[in-house]
Amino acid sequence: MEWTQIFIPIVVSFAITVSVMPLFIGYFQMKKQGQVTREDGPTWHSVKTGTPTMGGVVFLVASLITSLAMGLFFHQFTPSLLIILFILVLYGLLGYLDDFIKVFKKRNMGLNSRQKLIGQIFGGLVFYFVYRSEGFSDTLDLFGVAEVPLGIFYGVFIIFWLVGFSNAVNLTDGIDGLVAGLGTISFGTYAIIAWKQQQFDVVIICLSVIGGLIGFFPYNRKPAKIFMGDVGSLALGGLLAAISIILHQEWTLLLIGLVYVCETASVILQVASFKLFGRRIFKMSPIHHHFEMCGWSEWKIDFVFWSVGLICSGITLWILF
């Protein structure tokens, strides 16, 4: 795969997304179905009630079709490509079921946490067994300094990594355009890492997702015409975790995905502080809602969080190369 060919997956996935998204939005508007605002969410987000959701279906399908087609075209139809795409499909389906229940069954909480966790763990187990059957290493890279052999416990780590980051990205998806922008930066960084490792199958997936996210962004930027839904955010988080594992650069996701980590940490700290001390650390969690309550606009939050993601990704590449 030549560097001049990197635009092909981006353009194909982008074209599919921008072509189908207006039809998808039109369908939801015709059915008068849309986002159901959570009762524990910010009150000012009530104006977003009824906005079409599940836009992740479009850019995920575009990414899937493009990855498979380009994998065949560039002779990169590998086990790595297929197992990563398996996570895309499974976690996407989990998110789809969650969104479907919220939108069409009018239950604002969707699947319960136990149901989601069972599906996420199942995906992690399948990923691990395929990963080991293909002879991949069961050692954990510790910040490029040392490698620790985990044996069967690497399977536990894989499950933790996939579940943790799929939920982290899901928590981050609460501001118009935020995850679409952060995702583009994150997958762009992993495309560079994969290119340096000559794992072109992973490059194809990253570029396909980037094309889909770029095509989705004009419809998701404030004021959003459509949200990606859990179908998009759960799949994107699972994909990032799976890619970091396949590239054997797991630690990099802590830095590349620092915003996702901080969003999750803010929720954990908020809950722990309230239960232990009866006090809240933040005005609201995840932390992007805290900044909203401090008077920041959604665009300002987007810009600051994207900047953090870009800087952290740059530092990661500097450390590696």
Curated annotation (Swiss-Prot):
Top-level taxonomic group: Bacteria
EC number(s) per entry: 2.7.8.13
Gene Ontology biological process terms from the UniProt entry: cell division; cell wall organization; peptidoglycan biosynthetic process; regulation of cell shape
Compartment(s) where it occurs, according to its Swiss-Prot or TrEMBL record: Cell membrane
Membrane topology: Multi-pass membrane protein
Pathway: Cell wall biogenesis; peptidoglycan biosynthesis
Pfam families, sorted: Glycos_transf_4, MraY_sig1
NCBIfam families cross-referenced by the UniProt entry: mraY
Residue intervals passing through the bilayer: 6-26, 54-74, 77-97, 117-137, 143-163, 175-195, 200-220, 226-246, 251-271, 301-321
Catalytic activity line of the entry: UDP-N-acetyl-alpha-D-muramoyl-L-alanyl-gamma-D-glutamyl-L-lysyl-D-alanyl-D-alanine + di-trans,octa-cis-undecaprenyl phosphate = Mur2Ac(oyl-L-Ala-gamma-D-Glu-L-Lys-D-Ala-D-Ala)-di-trans,octa-cis-undecaprenyl diphosphate + UMP
Family that this chain belongs to: Belongs to the glycosyltransferase 4 family. MraY subfamily.
Entry keyword set: Cell cycle, Cell division, Cell membrane, Cell shape, Cell wall biogenesis/degradation, Magnesium, Membrane, Metal-binding, Peptidoglycan synthesis, Transferase, Transmembrane, Transmembrane helix
The protein's name in its UniProt record: Phospho-N-acetylmuramoyl-pentapeptide-transferase
Cofactors, names only: Mg(2+)
Organism: Enterococcus faecalis (strain ATCC 700802 / V583)
MF terms in GO: metal ion binding; phospho-N-acetylmuramoyl-pentapeptide-transferase activity
Cellular component terms (Gene Ontology): plasma membrane
